[in-house]
Amino acid sequence: MQITIERKPLGQIEADALIVPVFEGRRDARFGAEDLFASGEVAGKALEMTLLHHAPGVRATRVLLVGAGAAGKFDAAGMRRLSGAAVRFLKAKSVKKIALVLDSEFSGSNFASAAVEGALLGNFEPDRYKTGNEKKSLDTFIVAGDTPELESAVARGRILAEAQNFSRDLVNEPANLLTPLGMADAARKMAAEFGLECEVLDRDAMQKLGMGSLLGVAIGSAEPPVLIVLRYRPAKSEGAAHLGLVGKGVTFDTGGISIKPADGMEKMKYDMAGGAAMIGAMRAIAQLKPAIPVSAYIPAVENMPGSRAQRPGDIVTAMNGKTIEVINTDAEGRLILADALTYARRQGCTHLVDAATLTGAVVVALGHLNVGLFANDDAMRDRVLAAAKDEGERMWSLPLEDDYKEYLKSGFADIANVGGRWGGAITAAIFLKEFAEETPWVHLDIAGTAWLDENKPYLAKGPTGLPVRTLARLAMDWKA
């Protein structure tokens, strides 16, 4: 989809449709819709859609009045949803060229960025492998406004949304096509296009490094495991900080010997959403060029049953020397992240963020609206929460108290990989804390937010691409 800017009066914009936000309690005297406002048919409620044809005073053939809700509560996140919902509404009607009107009260650059993000995210469909002619997509999205920073804001919004959609495309790939090696190949191609360094560690390299925790997960699969490393190095680094991003890359998760139920297992191609988010974030970071170095580490494996697969009761030795009793082979994400976190620390990362579709327990706790956030450092937690708030990606801080480590006691090894029924999201984070050690670290459990089971007004069902925007913002806003 082409994104353009027009600094013209409203009546001179040529498009198939104009998108005009409307607040609750306000009447817009333009477009000949006074009767609709007076009758209450147009009330301005959030995401309410009213389509006008051949409205007076404009060249566009349609005007879409979109409810923005209460004016005092409308923010960039609201603009992102409004733009995405309007795009999805209009493209269903085969509209090809639309313009979103940013009046003076939307003059802030954050609104322009959010409008572009919403449009690109809303235009995305998980239909790559459909062969019919029924696909509908917009050709052109015009941002109509007059703020001085419009060009840079639109460019930033496009970078972030395209990176997020890149991540969504990766998650949508079926596991027979996106194997661990396939994921590495996608990362290599992206790195070459955007000027990042890319290194891929194979099984032999990981064995030499002592990554027994990661490799234990992979031994049941015919697909070889890899550790994907992406590096961004600024021309001039400010301060000593080096941000490390670690993402779970289980390209298909059967549960292993502790096998999952068949119902819904097809969705387990999305168990690499954390890794895909890190690849997407690095794509955005390469273009936005923050002042600090950023490296991403994506352990990519399949978790399969078989005659060679890891068994419940097995003991593996992680890269940092800790021994782990594998009670449940379906708690594999923490096992691969453990060695990736250790490797990131030894590579010089001073601050760490990991993202993983790690536990069903976080969905029980928070539903599908908030990412579960855990941190061993208050300042690091606050950085991530601030970035998430700015980008409209909802997160909620959960406890990480040492007392929960009691749940992970093993009679045979230093630690068990699961801690029983209660507090499962917390005990998973406590497990990872053993490998982050003293490095300031945030763990994001995205199991409830990485995937939509049905369409939203502003987003197609399937992968969401969270938390790509938060991670890019974190890097861009970093202050020593």
From Swiss-Prot:
Pfam families hit by this protein: Peptidase_M17, Peptidase_M17_N
Entry's localization field: Cytoplasm
GO molecular function ontology, one term from the record: manganese ion binding
Cofactor: Mn(2+)
UniProt: Mn(2+) 1 binding residues: D253, D330, E332
Record's catalysed reaction(s): Release of an N-terminal amino acid, Xaa-|-Yaa-, in which Xaa is preferably Leu, but may be other amino acids including Pro although not Arg or Lys, and Yaa may be Pro. Amino acid amides and methyl esters are also readily hydrolyzed, but rates on arylamides are exceedingly low; Release of an N-terminal amino acid, preferentially leucine, but not glutamic or aspartic acids
Gene3D superfamilies in the record: Leucine Aminopeptidase, subunit E, domain 1, Zn peptidases
Keyword Cytoplasm applies: yes
Stored SUPFAM superfamilies: Macro domain-like (SSF52949), Zn-dependent exopeptidases (SSF53187)
EC number: 3.4.11.1, 3.4.11.10
Note on how the cofactor is bound: Binds 2 manganese ions per subunit.
A single BP term in Gene Ontology: proteolysis
Positions of Mn(2+) 2 binding: K248, D253, D271, E332
Gene Ontology CC, one term: cytoplasm
Main location: cytoplasm
InterPro entries from the UniProt entry: Leucine_aapep/pepB (IPR011356), Macro_dom-like (IPR043472), Peptidase_M17_C (IPR000819), Peptidase_M17_leu_NH2_pept (IPR023042), Peptidase_M17_N (IPR008283)
Residues at the active site: K260, R334
HAMAP family for the chain: Cytosol_peptidase_M17 (MF_00181)
PANTHER family for this protein: CYTOSOL AMINOPEPTIDASE, LEUCINE AMINOPEPTIDASE-RELATED
Similarity-based family: Belongs to the peptidase M17 family.
Name listed for the protein in its UniProt record: Probable cytosol aminopeptidase
Chain's gene name: pepA
